[in-house]
Structures are given as C-alpha cells and as structure tokens.
Swiss-Prot record:
It comes from Solanum tuberosum (Potato). The record marks R49, F50 as: Reactive bond for trypsin. Induction: By jasmonate. InterPro entries: Kunitz_inhibitor_STI-like_sf, Prot_inh_Kunz-lg. Belongs to the protease inhibitor I3 (leguminous Kunitz-type inhibitor) family. Inhibitor of cathepsin D (aspartic protease). May also inhibit trypsin and chymotrypsin (serine proteases). Protects the plant by inhibiting proteases of invading organisms. CDD domains: beta-trefoil_STI_CPI-like (cd23372). One of its GO terms (cellular component) is vacuole. GO terms for molecular function: aspartic-type endopeptidase inhibitor activity; serine-type endopeptidase inhibitor activity. Disulfide bonds join C30-C75, C124-C134. Keywords: Aspartic protease inhibitor, Disulfide bond, Glycoprotein, Protease inhibitor, Serine protease inhibitor, Vacuole. This is Aspartic protease inhibitor 6.
Amino acid sequence: NSSYRIISIGRGALGGDVYLGKSPNSDAPCPDGVFRYNSDVGPSGTPVRFIPLSGGIFEDQLLNIQFNIPTVKLCVSYTIWKVGNLNAYFRTMLLETGGTIGQADNSYFKIVKSSKIGYNLLSCPFTSIICLRCPEDQFCAKVGVVIQNGKRRLALVNENPLDVLFQEV
C-alpha cells in the first residue's frame, strides 16, 4: 500500500504540507491533530495511506486516511483521521486523529477534483445509515484550514476548501 504526502498547490506562505501534530489543550497521550505547515519552505508533511472502503483508490470514493508512520502501540489509533466534535470557538469541526478503519462513523473522507486545480478532501459520513436513497455527497463537507494558536489546522469549511496534490513517498 503506497504512502503519499498531501501537499498544497500554493507556494511560499500559501504552501505547506499536511502533518500530524499535537493539538493545543489536548490531554491525548499522542499527537492528535491534523495540521498544515505555514509554508512550503521547511519540513515535509507526514506521509499518509488511503484505505478504501472497497476496491482500489479512486476519486469520489469513501476511504479512511491514516498517517503512515512508525508508532508505539498506544498511539496506533492516533494515526487515523476523523472529524472531531463541534469546536465552539471556531464554530466548526476540526480534523483530528483517533478515528477507526472501516466503521460507520466520522472517519470517512473522499478525494474529489477541485474546481480550481488539484483536489479537495471531503468529510463524508457513511450515508447508508442516514438515508438509503439520498445522493451520497449530500452530507459531505469540504476540508479547509482554520488558524489555531498560530498553526494551520484542517477543519470543515463552507468556502475556500484546501486545494491539494498527492506526492508518492
């Protein structure tokens, strides 16, 4: 299973790879936040692997995202992406780790073509539980960035989704 870095389209201060970091005010025993570096000059992002619900990895398909790094047993679940609870300060939900693979919960995402360049990430609940005949993307939300304590944190947004590319590691 290949690993990829999620890199942004922008350069300089508009750039920055996605990485696993410690969430402010978190009491989790392991890094538990999904962030983006403040510039494309500097460290590379944390590699991820995409785990499809079924079959291969394609656009517009439900999948889990896992940071693909060596870790101690205690921290294994802290590598799987999920959408956290509503954050009152940001009035949205932040991306964090602690998700599950293959479970009908808030750990599913999709990769879709951006309206500009590259791709966007969507957070999509496992909709067959909610509504059998609904269009699948009806409940999906775009992933973008909010600034948390000076760091760029991935979060659900209404506008300006993060445009990304994938670089095989």
